């Protein structure tokens, strides 16, 4: 198991990044709005403005660290599977392939030095076995995330349901780029309350990047991690005993 330990440790370190991401997101989502209030006596109105705070850059950075650490763990696994195949110095192309279509030549190139029985396991884990649903496969998602992060920061934005204004009539509402503004009667100023719904952070490609849109929530990062930890790594443990 000692050869597997390095890859397993890398994957375990990815979990550290994921836990860090959860903490950073939790801190932000606990108070996602800037709320400002002002009176306009001449209009006999009290205005409240709700605007999303900028998402800290640490959030997409940590998400990228998680993805690359997890992907690196799979490549280290492939390298060690070549080492136990009596290949002292595996070829630089040796890595854990992830393909959405039937293996092209690139699959063989990446797995040429790997123990043949292990290659069969790797092939069985490929996203293309899900047919048209390959984009739902955790490994495809991981690969897509790494391809995005390799070239740019993840685009991130906040989404939430409608903030409810309670106890008073709201005769005025105006949408803003990152929030909204409401106006209530000045006499209702001390009575107004609000309820903020659950807010989520969406990760994806920047809007100006060519290709299909790609967006996920943090729950998908957890799904990807659990798949690698619970369904990929155990498939190879027998090779290292």
Question: How should each PLM-predicted stretch be described?
Answer:
Residues 1-241:
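Acidic, Ser/Thr/Gly/Pro-rich intrinsically disordered interaction regions
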């Amino acid at each position: 198991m000692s050869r597997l330990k390095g890859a397993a440790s890398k994957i375990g370190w990815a979990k550290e990044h994921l836990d860090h991401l959860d903490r950073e997101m939790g801190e932000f989502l606990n108070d996602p709005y800037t709320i400002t209030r002002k009176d306009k006596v001449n209009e006999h109105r009290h205005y409240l403005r709700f605007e999303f705070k900028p998402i800290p850059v640490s959030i997409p950075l940590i998400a990228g660290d998680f993805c690359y650490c997890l992907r690196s763990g799979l490549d280290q696994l492939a390298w060690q599977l070549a080492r136990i195949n009596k290949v002292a110095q595996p070829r630089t192309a040796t890595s854990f392939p992830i393909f959405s279509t039937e293996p092209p030549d690139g699959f063989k190139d990446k797995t040429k030095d790997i123990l043949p029985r292990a290659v069969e396991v790797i092939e069985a884990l490929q996203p293309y076995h899900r047919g048209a649903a390959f984009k739902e496969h955790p490994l495809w998602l991981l690969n897509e995330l790494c391809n995005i992060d390799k070239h740019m920061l993840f685009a991130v934005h906040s989404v939430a349901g409608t903030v409810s204004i309670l106890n008073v009539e709201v005769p005025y509402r105006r949408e803003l780029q990152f929030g909204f503004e409401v106006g209530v009667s000045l006499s209702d100023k001390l009575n107004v309350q609000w309820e903020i719904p659950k807010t989520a952070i969406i990760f994806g490609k920047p809007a100006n990047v060519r290709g299909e849109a790609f967006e996920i929530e943090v729950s998908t990062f957890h799904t990807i991690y659990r798949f690698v930890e619970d369904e990929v790594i155990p498939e190879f443990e027998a090779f290292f005993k």
